[in-house]
A protein has these predicted regions:
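Hydrophobic alpha-helical connector segments
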Residues: 60, 74-103, 157-160
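N-terminal positioning helix adjacent to the helix-turn-helix/winged-helix DNA-binding module
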Residues: 4, 10-14, 18, 156
């Protein structure tokens, strides 16, 4: 990467980092582009070289932060995943991500408040940063390891994400309807049932 490209990447990363700080402290609706560029130390015109508007930088942040969560889960679990059956791989990765969010509740709040299926679908197909994981290829590899095949995998993934996002948000932040640790066995049994509903020949 040349010096010009390096400088561009540094400016983009600075804008992303600054926007995340504002969104998780001041709130998305109360944060302006002027706030972001002033703290990042760049001109407003520079912002528009990288992002269309405030919604665009928010969506790219969700994509980037989600990728980082997934990347860390895969890296930390490593070879432990290889010996597990398909459904247990999904649960192990989910558990690791949930634990990360439990340790970073501002990130949990940001993602849960702003995550939509459209944003997530864009995230898994269009990595923001060069070091973001290619989620779609990893997910396709996981699906290929399901011994019975998976029918409508996009619906299955949507339902798992919605379930995990909504239930863990309440359990982590408000201990409702119970603590996270008490919730986990019920959550993972439901994920197993969801996967079982989608098992079958895909052809």
């Amino acid at each position: 990467m040349g010096k010009v490209d390096t400088n561009k990447k540094l400016k983009e990363n600075s804008l992303l980092k600054t926007a995340f700080e504002f969104f998780t402290t001041k709130g998305f609706s109360k944060t302006s582009i002027t706030d972001i560029v002033s703290k990042a130390g760049v001109a407003k015109g520079t912002f528009y070289l990288y992002f269309k508007d405030k919604y665009d930088i928010r969506n790219k942040l969700i994509s980037h932060k989600s990728s980082q969560l997934f990347k860390k889960a895969i890296a930390d679990l490593g070879d432990k995943l290889d010996a597990l059956p398909f459904e247990e791989k999904i649960i192990k990765v989910s558990d690791h991500i949930i634990n990360q969010l439990n340790e970073n509740q501002s990130l949990l709040t940001f993602i849960s408040k702003n995550l939509s299926w459209g944003v997530f679908k864009t995230a898994i197909t269009s990595p923001v940063s060069d070091d973001d994981v290619d989620f779609s290829s990893i997910y396709e590899k996981l699906l290929s390891e399901a011994p019975k095949g998976i029918k409508d995998p996009e619906i299955m993934l949507f339902m798992i994400i919605e379930l995990v996002s909504s239930t863990c948000y309440s359990a982590i932040l408000y201990k409702e309807p119970c603590s996270l640790e008490k919730l986990k066995p019920y959550l993972y049994n439901n994920i197993r049932m969801m996967i079982a509903q989608h098992e079958g020949n895909t052809k």
